[in-house]
Amino acid sequence: MTNYAIILAAGKGTRMTSDLPKVLHKVSGLTMLEHVFRSVKAINPEKAVTVIGHKSEMVRAVLADQSAFVHQTEQLGTGHAVMMAETQLEGLEGHTLVIAGDTPLITGESLKSLIDFHVNHKNVATILTATAQDPFGYGRIVRNKDGEVIKIVEQKDANEYEQQLKEINTGTYVFDNKRLFEALKCITTNNAQGEYYLTDVVAIFRANKEKVGAYILRDFNESLGVNDRVALATAETVMRQRITQKHMVNGVTFQNPETVYIESDVEIAPDVLIEGNVTLKGRTHIGSGTVLTNGTYIVDSEIGDNCVVTNSMIESSVLAAGVTVGPYAHLRPGTTLDREVHIGNFVEVKGSHIGEKTKAGHLTYIGNAQVGSSVNVGAGTITVNYDGQNKYETVIGDHAFIGSNSTLIAPLEVGDNALTAAGSTISKTVPADSIVIGGSRQVTKEGYAKRLAHHPSGSK
């Protein structure tokens, strides 16, 4: 059995009120088109053809070499869009799935079941349908007294009886590939919209006494086509629920799943605890036994086993096992923390590697630095890495002790076991095992404060 796929992605999406093509709006971190394409891959298509139109280069870039593309210059209806794919699929033996690129909730399992139903029933066409409590706006499935599908009628063309029908067309179909393109040559624009309806091929097949069937979705949510921001929000809600439920089944604990945002490509190991208002985005991996507390935001990062991240932001960083971060810390892109590192409150790290068991507990900036293991970085320490034009590196050796309020002016190297005194400004190499005092010498003038305005006896 050879399968093909046609994805309809040419529309502008006027009701989205956006410069972005409709299918490129995101749901849980992926464009709607990407969600659809991932589901389509479940049927293992020999060839996938994406019909593009509005801002076609932007749409093409999302799938790149994963699909063939055809261009629909004018949007003259779904039938016309499928006609555009004829140059890619004409004459091929097999079954062709036709699906809209704005249906992000459709699952691969449902598409595979649709194909299997189509093949097992030897249909020339099979419609994916659903039962709607409120079918207004959808095309209706019209059956005869024997339950056979005889036609699909659009909302604007439906009579009073047809408008009462609850079974609706989801806009997804499977066809015998050759018969599809033969039937498309016979459809017209004689309808309320003045468009080429793909659904008109059903009546053509029926007139030729060819078998048309319908496979009914179990989950109505999968039929959602996103045409505006309201539907986009609905899709986001459903997808978020799916994602959190998947992780819970796999052993992740959520204290308040309704407030958590987790994107589609995030991986979470068992025995992770996630509190409320946590955001996990991009290609993030969370290791087993890790705890993410309220307000944590992580994107494109790898978090090792048994870490604790407390109300902090982590971007494009790698944390080994046993690391603790926060509260209110910020790990910026290019940060790597080895085992059991502690990054405390109001500490910012960027583009740096920090060795195991090193601690930076408070109010510190570490940028463009290589920090060894078992280093203590005192409160208020700053690596001065930028001169207005270039960034420079700071290297701190193993077991060094950086005193509070040290200012380390890069390029700079502090050797193993070295110590900087509190309040020092360091601009030259500190040899291993050395103590450096870089602050100004204290001068005390007894009684002088009485002459200053702040003193009770001072001048006013």
Swiss-Prot record:
Superkingdom of origin organism: Bacteria
Catalytic function, reaction form: alpha-D-glucosamine 1-phosphate + acetyl-CoA = N-acetyl-alpha-D-glucosamine 1-phosphate + CoA + H(+); N-acetyl-alpha-D-glucosamine 1-phosphate + UTP + H(+) = UDP-N-acetyl-alpha-D-glucosamine + diphosphate
Cofactor note: Binds 1 Mg(2+) ion per subunit.
Segments of this protein annotated with the region N-acetyltransferase: 251-460
GO CC annotation, single: cytoplasm
Role of this protein: Catalyzes the last two sequential reactions in the de novo biosynthetic pathway for UDP-N-acetylglucosamine (UDP-GlcNAc). The C-terminal domain catalyzes the transfer of acetyl group from acetyl coenzyme A to glucosamine-1-phosphate (GlcN-1-P) to produce N-acetylglucosamine-1-phosphate (GlcNAc-1-P), which is converted into UDP-GlcNAc by the transfer of uridine 5-monophosphate (from uridine 5-triphosphate), a reaction catalyzed by the N-terminal domain.
Name of the protein: Bifunctional protein GlmU
Organism: Streptococcus pyogenes serotype M4 (strain MGAS10750)
Gene: glmU
